[in-house]
């Protein structure tokens, strides 16, 4: 399986995470996704809580790669809302920080991590049923023991977005 971003192989190929189960473990361990977007003011990046849907390749006819969709929420106005609605192409990054790797001299130090980097398309969710589903995915990921339920008033003042991740790679440094 290859989730390599189009056009460029990973420079340190030995650090690439290739298995669907290992990639999902990284996504599941992350609490925050950083979403990069571009508007007329320039490039910006915003950290967000997220939930996700995952489909393994075995369950996808004609696919050798897993499918990942991220669910995020926002208030009803602001720069992020404006750019997501105007320019849906985004890049994402999420990581699990594992700690400092010590060395015998300063340049031998490094950092252990596991990460996912990718690109996708943001879709604003309109229907109350799908907005509720998106919030449930976020809560299932971040607070699985929380009591379910969202009022119609909460749904009305919350924007929900689903980001279809089209290409992503996993990388780790132990």
Language model regions located:
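Charged, gly/pro-rich active-site loop segments
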Residues: 2-14, 97-174
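Short, basic/aromatic recognition patches
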Residues: 5-34
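A generic structural signal for nonpolar/aromatic side chains embedded in well-ordered alpha-helices
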Residues: 26-27, 83-84, 138
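Short beta-strand segments
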Residues: 30-76
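A generic structural signal for short beta-strands and their flanking turns/coil linkers
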Residues: 31-33, 46, 66-68, 86-90, ...
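Short, structured patches in soluble enzyme cores that scaffold and shape functional sites
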Residues: 37-39, 74, 94-96, 164-167
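Short, charge-rich binding segments
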Residues: 62-64, 81-86, 106-110
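Helix-adjacent hinge/juxtasegments
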Residues: 73-74, 79-100
């Amino acid at each position: 399986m290859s989730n390599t971003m189009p056009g460029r192989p990973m420079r340190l190929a030995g650090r690439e995470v290739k298995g669907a189960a290992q990639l999902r473990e990284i996504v599941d361990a992350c609490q925050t996704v950083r979403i990069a977007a571009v508007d007329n003011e320039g490039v910006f990046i915003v950290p967000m809580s997220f939930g996700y849907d995952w489909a393994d390749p075995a369950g996808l006819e004609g696919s050798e790669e897993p499918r990942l969709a991220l669910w995020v929420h926002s208030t009803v106005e602001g720069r992020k809302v404006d750019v997501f609605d105007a320019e849906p192409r985004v890049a994402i990054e999420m990581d699990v920080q594992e700690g400092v790797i010590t060395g015998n001299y300063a340049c031998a130090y490094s950092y252990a991590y596991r990460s996912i980097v990718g690109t996708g398309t943001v879709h604003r969710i309109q229907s109350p049923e799908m907005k509720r589903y998106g919030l449930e995915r976020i809560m299932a990921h971040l607070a699985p023991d929380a009591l379910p339920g969202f009022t119609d008033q909460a749904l009305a003042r919350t924007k929900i977005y689903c980001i279809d991740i089209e290409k992503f790679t996993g990388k780790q440094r132990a």
